[in-house]
Amino acid sequence: MTNSIEDVCEQAQVILLVGSNPEEAHPVMGMRIRQAVERGAKLIVVDPRDIGLASKADIHLKLRPGTNVAFANGMAHAIIAQGLADKEFVENRTEGFEEFAVMVADYTPEKVAEICGIDADDLVQAATMYAKADRAPIIYCLGVAEHSTGTEGVMSMSNMAMLVGKLGR
């Protein structure tokens, strides 16, 4: 998670929930996310399961299990392709952007749709919604972290947040 609970519940405009079922695993947080959605925050659920919060989601991307990294790289591709990266943040606070952009260039929405079993247009819509929001935390949990590609999954979520300058926002 890239933000405090207060940031998520009181400030978020978009919440990107990846591989996490907070209503079951963290009920207080789940309730607070539900309240944030009720106050107008947009919700993107990325989970193969029909978790409770999926019914409140603006977009539900039901990835094939094990495809979190491809999903995140596809989001990054769409963000870069649309010119939505936070150039100032990337230039001043990150390194290796050029190499990263080359790496995600192969993760077109169509390719990611095939890998993940999702709709390419939904991926682009999610990337756009996430990138354009001023305050959009990523909340991930065991569905990302406790996987054979967990380290890469967590790094991919961090890369996505840094790409749009949303660490702490």
Go through each PLM region and give its residues.
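Cofactor-pocket helix-loop regions in the catalytic cores of large enzyme subunits
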Residues: M1-R169
